[in-house]
Amino acid sequence: MSLIQKSEHIEPASSAALSAAKTEMLTLICHISHTQLLQLCRTNKLDAKQLQLCQQLARQLSSCPVHVYYRPLCSTQMLTAMTLGTQTDTWLSETGKKDLLTAYLADQLCWQLLENGYQRWSEALKQLTGQVMTGMQFIGNDDPAELASYLKQLTQSEIRILPGGCMQPLKTVLFLADLAPDNAANKKSAPAGVCADCPHPCAYRKDSL
């Protein structure tokens, strides 16, 4: 069974085509493994009964899809927003009413699910672009203006910025996915012809300034 829903191949495009690129959306199906649950329990020194609680929470969370909104900024960077959606916010609110341990574990499992989503997104990017993801540059809420500027470039209605500068749904991340040709070293620079007229200040252009 595919772990990716609605994936469309993106053909290599010119700088002009990239600047006019539209926001696309796909859904990733992610799961938290038993090994990851054991690691969470070891890290937090939990006992067997608390491991059962982790397993129960993970099963509840398994029905949560990971939504990804993406748009190429240039041939070497993909602007990406990844979210667990408002249904997860509701679930966290309900589990948070039980006790502090349950609330903490539920929160940790959500971040683990997002982390698993990064790997699935890396696999999806290779299918979509023929390139590999070599790095992720997270855009944090420490700079609300920058956060708003990047999020505005994604045409979508699910994610918004709250007055305090945080994104909603709460389990949402925004980042730039660095792309490189799929070769052994993954260090090949972008062709000069592709980047010559590109206005996006990615690492390739910064190195030449």
Whereabouts are the PLM-identified features?
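Generic secondary-structure signature for well-ordered alpha-helical cores
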Residues: 63, 126, 130, 200-203, ...
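Active-site helix-to-loop segments that bind/position phosphate- or nucleotide-bearing substrates
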Residues: 1-98, 102
